[in-house]
């Protein structure tokens, strides 16, 4: 990430932000880039975007079919040489990536929640996840030679994330009249998110009572050997765009069937629930 940030601030002058994660993260990154000598611009696509980044920004309120021309005109008018987004599979970001791919003077940068979590952020050029330029050869990672990673002292921001999400979706709904043509990449019903966050909170509290003992057993090798099977959010683009599965349910079914057929009978399958699902 440091390599890409260094390249960004030393080679790009006029930077355009599209959608970021819910909360003030993009605003803070923009302030840091300004201090580094960059000119920063922002296009808001809904009321949530506008709430967290209202100053020095413009709103796009037309249909998505008109976004390519709008974006190309904006890039030309402001001499944009870099676009920064959060996630590269949202429909507006796909359009931006397509424009960047056809323009040798325009670079495309993507933030994503860390491949390693907690306490890490992913930032790559040209794409993340399935579009990442990272090597996909298993041997590359086997030969890196890293035996341990320093433990971060960062604090959990789980409840801040919930607060930002609620604020974001409230303002998305409140300004729906302004951004009536906006197409969101996920379900936008506030009741949908509220009910699922409540269920997730209950599950989280329950896990705090049960999991410590189970984790201790794993650490003490009472379930050895074991294989970790980390789950993804059901609506995540890793599943929707970069996998042959239509849902986590089908993915789990496939892994369990395979494990039962081919794993050693003394092995354990440790399924890790996604913290944001």
Each language-model region and where it sits:
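Active-site-proximal region of nucleotide-activated glycan assembly enzymes
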Residues: 107-203
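Active-site and donor-binding regions of nucleotide-sugar-utilizing enzymes
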Residues: 18-28, 45-141, 277
């Amino acid at each position: 990430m440091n390599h890409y940030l260094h390249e960004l601030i030393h080679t790009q002058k006029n930077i355009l932000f599209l959608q970021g994660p819910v909360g003030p993260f993009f605003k803070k990154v923009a302030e840091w880039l300004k201090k580094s000598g960059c000119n920063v611009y922002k296009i808001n696509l809904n009321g949530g975007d506008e709430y967290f980044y209202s100053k020095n920004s413009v709103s796009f309120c037309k249909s998505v079919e008109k976004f390519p021309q709008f974006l190309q005109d904006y890039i030309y008018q402001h001499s944009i040489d870099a676009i920064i987004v959060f996630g590269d599979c949202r429909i507006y970001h796909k359009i931006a990536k397509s424009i960047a791919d056809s323009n040798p003077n325009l670079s495309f940068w993507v933030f994503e929640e860390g491949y390693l979590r907690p306490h890490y952020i992913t930032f790559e050029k040209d794409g993340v996840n399935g579009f990442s330029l990272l090597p996909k050869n298993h041997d590359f990672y086997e030969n890196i030679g890293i035996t341990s990673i320093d433990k971060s002292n960062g604090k959990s921001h789980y409840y801040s994330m919930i607060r930002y999400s609620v604020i974001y979706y409230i303002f998305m709904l409140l300004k729906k009249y302004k951004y009536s043509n906006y197409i969101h990449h996920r379900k936008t019903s506030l009741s949908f998110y509220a009910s699922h966050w409540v269920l997730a909170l209950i599950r989280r509290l329950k896990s705090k009572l049960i999991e410590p003992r189970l984790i201790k057993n794993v650490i003490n090798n009472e379930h050895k050997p074991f294989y970790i099977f980390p789950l993804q959010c059901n609506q995540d683009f890793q599943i929707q765009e970069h996998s042959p599965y239509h849902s986590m349910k089908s993915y789990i079914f496939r892994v369990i069937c395979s494990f039962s057929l081919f794993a050693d009978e003394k092995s354990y399958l440790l399924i890790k629930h996604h913290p944001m699902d």
